[in-house]
């Protein structure tokens, strides 16, 4: 089970939002590269970056912070990034710059042709981020709820060659209310590609529940507010996950 620390970038700083609201942000650090190093030193085996300004603007914004993170830890572990990725040129620049995975969210839903092209051009590097509430997909920084069913869309994307799905329950994100295990497992069972859980991780009990369903196709979990607020000790949680799943 991969525990993946999230570094959410707003105006060059590390922040956490409450339920995706840019007006409800808490700053946890002003040096994103140092934050990345902290999580790597604590045992992280992948990092999850979000360009929040990019997600809302529809174009990459936190260039300097992302570059600094990749320079600091890019050789140590895979880094994945979402937020504002809307064209192939952006993907190419990120991958050439050392990013392992790009996460396409809104654009995958609104412009499926772009996602298809991205999978063709950058096979093995494309993750889709599906944000949902009550099983329905949301777009545009969670501000718009669509009529699309999560499972139906994910199956289509799987057919196109997407590497994995990051599934976020937006009713829980940043609320420390617990991962929506049932919905995450339902999605994972419908797919052959891995699912990464996100949204609401509250503590060690969530980690233990996720480890119990790893065999269903839940590969990892994004660790956000809980590891910044102190509700979850990241190093201890990754060690516990490894113990439960028999990893070295």
Swiss-Prot record:
Pathway: Amino-acid biosynthesis; L-histidine biosynthesis; L-histidine from 5-phospho-alpha-D-ribose 1-diphosphate: step 4/9. The active site is at residues 8, 131. It is found in: Cytoplasm. It catalyses: 1-(5-phospho-beta-D-ribosyl)-5-[(5-phospho-beta-D-ribosylamino)methylideneamino]imidazole-4-carboxamide = 5-[(5-phospho-1-deoxy-D-ribulos-1-ylimino)methylamino]-1-(5-phospho-beta-D-ribosyl)imidazole-4-carboxamide. GO terms for cellular component: cytoplasm. SUPFAM superfamilies: Ribulose-phoshate binding barrel (SSF51366). PANTHER family: 1-(5-PHOSPHORIBOSYL)-5-[(5-PHOSPHORIBOSYLAMINO)METHYLIDENEAMINO] IMIDAZOLE-4-CARBOXAMIDE ISOMERASE. Belongs to the HisA/HisF family. This is 1-(5-phosphoribosyl)-5-[(5-phosphoribosylamino)methylideneamino] imidazole-4-carboxamide isomerase.
